[in-house]
Amino acid sequence: MPTTFTLLESSPTLTHVAIIGALDLVGTREIELKLTASTAGRHKPVIIDISQVHFVASAGLGLLIQIARSLITDKHSTILLAPNQTIQQTIHVSKLGSMLRIALTLEEALEMAKLPAVSIVRT
């Protein structure tokens, strides 16, 4: 099954997309350009529903980081909605929680989208 994404909302204040499938090397390549244009290209806070993503490889994580970094420059947040336990642990262990915020419900994600993104300070 190919990896796909759907644009759920594109308002003046928010972008909301849903990804279905695996964010492995092949799946990431299938959606990378269009997903980046639909999210980072809009320069608005983004909610990425990954409730139907069962696997994220390094390529998929890299894509999510790329989107988040692009939005952080505009002080906008990238929120991952309803990731499975494995993906949550990957974000936590990788110390990416300030860049890729996790929300378990849409209501929580919408509240997070109102907050400015935290800049990542490198030491």
Task: Label the model's feature ranges.
Residues 1-18:
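Short beta-strand/loop segment at the start of cytosolic alpha/beta domains
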Residues 11-12, 51, 107:
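Conserved catalytic submotifs in the C-terminal HATPase_c
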Residues 104-123:
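A charged, well-structured terminal subsegment
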